[in-house]
A protein has these predicted regions:
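Flexible, glycine-rich loop/tail regions that form catalytic "lids" or insertion modules at the edges
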Residues: 51, 61-210
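Acidic, glycine-rich flexible loop/linker segments
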Residues: 1-76, 80-94
């Protein structure tokens, strides 16, 4: 301990229970509900009144939650869907757009992704309740933080680096927990919520047809 050097790019494994850090990729197994705990939980299910729902925003998380007995999704945070590498550029394009038309063009690229996200989740939940939270955090959280990413965004959107930096500065908030977020964001940019609602309803319609 104390004399091991880990270089950038090397894999490590962290035991979340003990805090132990191990060099390299340690084989893992998926936890199972078994033994006495499984028996006690089955007894509890016969008498409990409380229903337990999960936080999930991906198909895999939804499957895991169902496996462990979740009876729906209590919070599906849609902002997590926007950080995926194959859609973050469209999100940034939407944020940096100067006109409603440009924003709509960027949102039209995001619509199929959102629809597919919701469709997968609704399919796994198979009729169980799903509470979807529309885009909540301040927009600056989706913008690049370092010069390399700023240059990449500026180049891909045909904007000047200074222009992108100025927009990031304009959107930055000292206390984002109380700032331009949630319903305030929806009032300022209703087209974002319109796209998300359209994605939800289209996902439901397609599932019904399937």
């Amino acid at each position: 301990a104390g004399n091991i050097i880990v270089k950038e790019g090397e894999l490590i494994t962290i035991d979340g229970g003990s805090g132990k850090v191990m060099k390299g990729l340690v084989p893992t197994v998926q936890p199972e509900i078994s033994g006495y705990f499984s028996t006690i939980m089955s007894w509890a299910d016969k008498f409990r009144k409380l229903k337990v729902r999960t936080n999930a925003e991906t198909e895999n998380d939804s499957k895991t939650a169902r496996k462990f007995g979740a009876e729906g999704i209590g919070l599906c945070r849609t902002e997590h869907m926007f950080f995926d590498e194959n859609r973050i550029l469209s999100v940034r394009q939407m944020i940096l757009s100067k006109s409603r038309q440009d924003r709509d063009n960027a949102l039209s690229k995001l619509l199929p992704f959102q629809k597919n996200d919701f469709k997968q989740i609704f399919k796994v939940m198979s009729g169980l309740p799903v509470t979807v939270r529309l885009l909540d955090p301040p927009l600056h959280e989706f913008l690049p933080k370092n010069s390399k990413d700023i240059e990449e965004v500026a180049r891909s959107l045909n904007l000047g680096i200074k222009e992108v930096e100025n927009r990031i500065f304009e959107l930055h908030e000292e206390n984002p927990m109380l700032g331009h977020r949630g319903c305030r964001l929806g009032i300022s940019f209703p087209e974002i919520y319109e796209m998300q609602c359209e994605a939800i309803f289209k996902a439901l319609v397609e599932l019904k047809k399937d």
